[in-house]
Amino acid sequence: MSPQTETKAGVGFKAGVKEYKLTYYTPEYETKDTDILAAFRVTPQPGVPPEERGDAVAAESSTGTWTTVWTDGLTSLDRYKGRCYHIEPVPGEEDQFIAYVAYPLDLFEEGSVTNMFTSIVGNVFGFKALRALRLEDLRIPVAYVKTFQGPPHGIQVERDKLNKYGRPLLGCTIKPKLGLSAKNYGRAVYECLRGGLDFTKDDENVNSQPFMRWRDRFLFCAEAIYKSQAETGEIKGHYLNATAGTCEEMIKRAVFARELGVPIVMHDYLTGGFTANTSLSHYCRDNGLLLHIHRAMHAVIDRQKNHGMHFRVLAKALRMSGGDHIHSGTVVGKLEGERDITLGFVDLLRDDYIEQDRSRGIYFTQDWVSLPGVLPVASRGIHVWHMPALTEIFGDDSVLQFGGGTLGHPWGNAPGAVANRVALEACVKARNEGRDLAAEGGEIIREACKWSP
């Protein structure tokens, strides 16, 4: 054996299993401005101390494996390892705790949400030492934020493109979601836009099915957009769903939308994937298209309170990957605590700088620097009588999206759109006059009904 390859017994590498806490639990660690910070809700198996599971999360989501390997000696684990630097109990939950983990920035590819999630929420979620694991929040450092393009255009550029200011935007999802022919679909789009809405929307299920191929839908919707624009003098749009089975097909549909001259396309970013979403976002910025994002499949990931990811993490990821709108749900009729949590991630979508506020579910201060903001889309079972609350809660920088709340009007689609627009303008006017929308909302809507055509 040559001197270069000879291994001497008892010298150098020592095989065996090390306890994670000896390497990855570092309560004395002071986080760096360049670290990605994560807050995990950990539910360990019975009898396992918190620090032994917090360090396991840090290890399994960074450089760790189940045993010591000789190639550990070929790199600097202290430079690249994740560190569990703080553990705190969850109030009211005896068997849960929050583990805070810091990841060095060099662990992640620049501008790739896909790579970031592959590490942080990869195999560790199947770790058998844990009963459940939930990622509650991430702090994205400025150094990493600056590697992302973010939304194609952002809130201010969208308002400038549409020439619409001082109020929320109005939308409507065309129903029934499946089964209409392209021509009948386009007719419904026209009626809603002509009645006063700013946007109509493809349902997330609508791609290119036998009853309505995508190219036919795009053509009839473009006709509806141009006809309603000519009659109202306002810029209109329809969220043309470009989601497809391949990235190439998705971009082909976006190219056709651009050739038609329409202002906006749509993508299902979770089912489509972050790589596809970022590719489409880059195309939209380069070609002047707005990008509406639907969150189909989010409840599979975020519904369980002790496992998966909170939606605020998915919202941050979308702002990085790129989208001008994203569905955020509504808070109408919800408990006050849920309202605060929802508005916490709405601020994470819109604002440049958000302070830590645990009462609103914000675990870390987040600085987005120059990354454009995203308009939250309030949808799901809302109607005209919710307008005062929606206007007060979401403010001007939002999209209020009514499906059945428009198309379910007893007089038809266009009167439903008129009702939405009249109610919105009445609420904005009342708010600007200093009236209390929470206390006087019903009266404001009834007054608008009285004088509405």
Swiss-Prot record:
Give the Enzyme Commission number.
4.1.1.39
Positions annotated to bind Mg(2+): K201, D203, E204
> Which positions does the site annotation Transition state stabilizer cover?
K334
Q: Which domain of life is it from?
A: Eukaryota
N6-carboxylysine PTM positions = K201
Cofactor(s), names only, from the UniProt record: Mg(2+)
Cofactor note as given: Binds 1 Mg(2+) ion per subunit.
Describe its partners and assembly state: Heterohexadecamer of 8 large chains and 8 small chains; disulfide-linked. The disulfide link is formed within the large subunit homodimers.
Any miscellaneous information on file? The basic functional RuBisCO is composed of a large chain homodimer in a 'head-to-tail' conformation. In form I RuBisCO this homodimer is arranged in a barrel-like tetramer with the small subunits forming a tetrameric 'cap' on each end of the 'barrel'.
Q: Which PANTHER family match?
A: RIBULOSE BISPHOSPHATE CARBOXYLASE (PTHR42704), RIBULOSE BISPHOSPHATE CARBOXYLASE LARGE CHAIN (PTHR42704:SF16)
Q: What's the protein here called? A: Ribulose bisphosphate carboxylase large chain
Organism per entry: Crucianella angustifolia
Q: Which gene specifies this protein's sequence?
A: rbcL
